[in-house]
């Protein structure tokens, strides 16, 4: 009878030891996994921004009436389009911006770097960083019109050259 109890006690100790080891491994790897996930989100969003920029510049180069579609997916963060319509008719900002929290550091904290036409900035906020990717068309476009202000999830965009450097972006 005593031998049977010893076997059960040993089994419980081995299971408890296994659970403790599993918990330690998970606690050690979770921050690294989260940082890699944030890095992948940043890289995918940067690729989306390059795609949108390339499409806008192609449509602009082709002249009035030219249009293209772009499929995008915004997984995390806030993707917004500023048309400058709320500002006086001086030089109003025309920007496409993505901002999101991250454990990944995309650029030196507090400075802005340029990669192609994308401006990348990183600001420390508590234990995380706030990454901002910006496409600034203020000096490149006469107008930027859209029915979309903030995007999240999957979208098909129609980017069209309306006339004389005016671009419209619509969800389809």
What is the predicted function of each stretch?
Residues 2-29, 37, 41:
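N-terminal single-pass transmembrane signal-anchor helix
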Residues 4-12, 70, 86-90, 103-105:
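Solvent-exposed, charged interface segments at domain starts and junctions
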Residues 13-15, 39-42, 66, 78-80, ...:
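A generic structural micro-environment signature
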Residues 24-26, 50, 73, 113-115:
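General N-terminal targeting signals
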Residues 34-66:
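Membrane-proximal N-terminal amphipathic helix
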Residues 51-54, 73, 149-152:
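Short amphipathic alpha-helical surface micro-motifs
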Residues 59-81:
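Short, glycine/small-hydrophobic-rich surface segments
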Residues 82-172:
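Intrinsically disordered, low-complexity regions enriched in Pro/Ser/Thr/Gly and acidic residues
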């Amino acid at each position: 009878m005593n031998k049977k109890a010893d076997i059960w006690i040993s089994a419980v100790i081995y299971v408890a030891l296994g659970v403790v080891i599993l918990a330690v491994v998970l606690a050690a790897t979770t921050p690294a996994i989260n940082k890699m996930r944030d890095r992948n989100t940043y890289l995918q969003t940067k690729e989306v921004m390059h795609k949108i920029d390339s499409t806008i510049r192609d449509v602009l180069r082709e002249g009035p009436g030219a249009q293209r579609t772009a499929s995008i997916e915004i997984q995390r963060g806030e993707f917004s389009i500023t048309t400058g319509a709320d500002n006086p008719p001086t030089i109003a900002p025309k920007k496409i911006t993505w901002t999101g929290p991250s454990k990944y550091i995309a650029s030196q904290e507090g400075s802005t770097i340029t990669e192609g036409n994308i401006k990348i900035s990183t600001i420390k906020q508590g234990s995380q960083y706030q990454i901002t990717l910006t496409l600034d068309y203020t000096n490149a476009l006469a107008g930027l019109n859209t029915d979309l202000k903030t995007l999240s999830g999957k979208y098909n965009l129609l980017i069209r050259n309306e006339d004389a450097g005016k671009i419209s972006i619509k969800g389809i």
